[in-house]
Amino acid sequence: DEYGKSDIGKNKTIIVEYSSPNIAKPFHIGHLRTTLIGKALYDIYKYLGYNTIGINHLGDYGTQFGKMIEGYKRWGQEYNIEDNPIEELTKIYVRINELCKSDESVLEDCRENFKKLEEGDKYCVELWKKFRDLSLKEFYRIYDLLDVKFDSLNGEAFYSDKTDEVIEILEKTGKLIESNGAKIIDLEDKKMPPCIICKSNGSTIYATRDLAAILCRARTYDFDKCLYV
């Protein structure tokens, strides 16, 4: 039982981020791959004496939730999301997405919903929590079968109120420039497209929240290494 055990990780902290499914969407083979590889790495590092932190960085925020909220407002009573959350929420998302393609005003309503969610609108927040809780219930049915556990479920939403500092740091260091009302980082010297940090309507994107996550984790865990699986 002790074969391969070591203390080479003594007094060192490592973060392993794995699984990270999207709320209100199916848990697919890609999520299964990162879940199993991440669990293996988590167990190995723990066996080597590291203070190992397993994080499930849930995809629980973003403009898609503006669409989910709009779809639920329009047709929620037609779907049984309580008994079959992922399948029914997916149907709502597909339906509202199709409508957005043909009607720009609906897409604008969805964007406004997400803006309200960011600002803490009670109705939007309550719906978001409902989608998240129902999705997690389904995800944990799978995690329990695989004997997978996490130390943190802090996803994108957790960092949504921590992005102002990221923007402030980037502005102070001269890395942000304005483009068509949005705030971006120019990555032309890296031969990459620009990275949007703040949209013209003031909303943040995944990259903004990911930077906030890195900053928060560094302060919380003072980690030596962070693995993204």
Regions found by a protein language model. Give the residues of each.
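NTP-dependent nucleotidyl-transfer catalytic core
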Residues: D1-V229
